[in-house]
């Protein structure tokens, strides 16, 4: 599933790597439950600047124009965007979180009980209650940064007949 930095990956690359690109959002049916998977950025509705940027860079025309530029220029643009993002983080700017109503709407439209997403990277579980009284869960994944101290390499493991587990691969390794 495309995220902030890999939205240019296409079907040709995915096929060459043996990957399947997932639409955002995607419903995963596992162990008799419907799980809604999303990058999560489309649900951060209060971050108007980011939504505008997202719309721009996900457009076919922008991507075609970007990929037509020389590699050196594309790398410079990517570094500049990353530097802007890091500066915003360092400034202590508050980021918009997922819009609860939009998340609940997606869950109900897909008949899913749990939304699993990243983007906000504030790992936690959030309970969502609908007007009709049904309860849904939003599970937020951490970001991945192997060079951070300590490394952030956390996953959510789904197993049949067991509750999902958050696993820190930097501590436990693959099991």
What is the predicted function of each stretch?
Residues 16-25, 34-36, 41, 47-51, ...:
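Conserved beta-sheet core of the metallophosphoesterase superfamily
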Residues 1, 5-8, 53, 117, ...:
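Broad hydrophobic/π-residue packing in well-ordered secondary structure
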Residues 166-175:
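Short, solvent-exposed aromatic-acidic interface loops
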Residues 10, 28, 43-45, 147, ...:
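A generic signature of intrinsically disordered, low-complexity regions enriched in glycine/proline
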Residues 1-3, 8, 35-39, 57-64, ...:
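Low-complexity, flexible helical/coil segments
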Residues 1-32:
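Core catalytic region of metal-dependent phosphoesterases/phosphodiesterases
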Residues 38-99:
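Active-site-proximal loop/helix segment associated with metal-binding centers of metalloenzymes
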Residues 1-5, 78-83, 91, 99-105, ...:
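Generic detector of short, locally flexible boundary/turn motifs and exposed helical patches
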């Amino acid at each position: 599933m495309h995220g902030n930095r890999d939205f240019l990956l296409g079907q040709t690359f995915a096929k060459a790597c043996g990957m399947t690109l997932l639409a955002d959002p995607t419903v995963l049916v596992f162990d008799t439950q419907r799980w809604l998977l999303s990058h999560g950025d489309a649900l951060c509705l209060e971050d108007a600047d980011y939504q505008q940027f997202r719309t721009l860079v996900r457009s076919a025309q922008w991507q075609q124009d970007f990929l037509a530029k020389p590699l050196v220029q594309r790398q410079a643009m990517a570094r500049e965007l990353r530097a802007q993002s890091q500066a915003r983080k360092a400034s202590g700017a508050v980021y918009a979180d997922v819009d609860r109503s939009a998340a609940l709407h997606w869950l109900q439209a897909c008949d899913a009980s749990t939304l699993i997403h990243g983007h906000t990277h504030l790992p936690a579980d959030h309970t969502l209650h609908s007007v009709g009284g049904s309860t849904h869960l939003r599970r937020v994944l951490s970001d991945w940064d192997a060079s951070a101290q300590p490394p952030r390499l956390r996953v959510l493991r789904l197993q049949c007949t067991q509750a999902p587990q958050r696993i820190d691969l930097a501590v436990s390794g693959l099991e």
